[in-house]
């Protein structure tokens, strides 16, 4: 098993020095699901929510969150992202919204945290916009789907839904 990269020899948290790493194209995809009552989901699909377009707001929130991950999570590097995409799909058969994010850059460190932050904040935004009509909405399965680039190699999650 690999060592924790954010812990130094003295056991203290520190920001990893990436200055000697080679730049490469790095990409990560993450997902989250927001599970709700059928009528809450239908309100989103119909566009009848009094706060406006839930998907558009969640998409923008996710993109903005990816760009600000370094401000939210200690020890993350500020990154010059070249692409952030947040896709939201209503899945009425499962009473949920599937959120998938994609982050890409050419740089010295990965974008997994940015992809996870984008999916998480998009999910939180859906909850925030819908909590007035349903308080027991569930955010679940927030996870990394894949990553590519960098010396640690590629990763692909096992499908579970």
Curated annotation (Swiss-Prot):
The active site is at 128. Keywords: Lyase, Molybdenum cofactor biosynthesis. Pathway: Cofactor biosynthesis; molybdopterin biosynthesis. Coiled coil: none annotated. Catalyzes the conversion of (8S)-3',8-cyclo-7,8-dihydroguanosine 5'-triphosphate to cyclic pyranopterin monophosphate (cPMP). It comes from the Bacteria. GO terms for molecular function: cyclic pyranopterin monophosphate synthase activity; GTP 3',8'-cyclase activity. Homohexamer; trimer of dimers. The gene is moaC. It is an enzyme of class 4 (lyase). Belongs to the MoaC family. Its EC number is 4.6.1.17. It comes from Erwinia tasmaniensis (strain DSM 17950 / CFBP 7177 / CIP 109463 / NCPPB 4357 / Et1/99). InterPro entries: MoaC (IPR023045), MoaC_bact/euk (IPR047594), MoaC_sf (IPR036522), MoCo_biosynth_MoaA/MoaC (IPR050105), Mopterin_CF_biosynth-C_dom (IPR002820). GO terms for biological process: Mo-molybdopterin cofactor biosynthetic process. The keyword Ribonucleoprotein does not apply. The keyword Lyase applies. Substrate binds at residues 75-77, 113-114. It catalyses: (8S)-3',8-cyclo-7,8-dihydroguanosine 5'-triphosphate = cyclic pyranopterin phosphate + diphosphate. This is Cyclic pyranopterin monophosphate synthase. It holds the Pfam family MoaC.
């Amino acid at each position: 098993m690999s060592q924790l990269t954010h812990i130094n020899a003295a056991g203290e948290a520190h920001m990893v020095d990436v200055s000697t790493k080679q730049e490469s194209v790095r990409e990560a995809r993450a997902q989250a699901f927001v599970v709700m009552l059928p009528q809450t989901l239908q309100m989103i699909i119909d566009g009848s929510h009094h706060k406006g377009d839930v998907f558009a707001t969640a998409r923008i929130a996710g993109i903005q969150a990816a760009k600000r991950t370094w401000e939210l999570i200690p020890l993350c590097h500020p990154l010059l992202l070249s692409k952030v995409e947040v896709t939201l799909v209503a899945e009425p058969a499962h009473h949920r919204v599937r959120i998938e994010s994609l982050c890409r850059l050419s740089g010295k460190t990965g974008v997994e945290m940015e992809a996870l932050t984008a999916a998480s904040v998009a999910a939180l935004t859906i909850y925030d916009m819908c909590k007035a009509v349903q308080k027991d909405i569930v955010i679940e399965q927030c996870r990394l789907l894949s990553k590519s680039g960098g010396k640690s190699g590629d990763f692909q999650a096992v499908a579970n839904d």
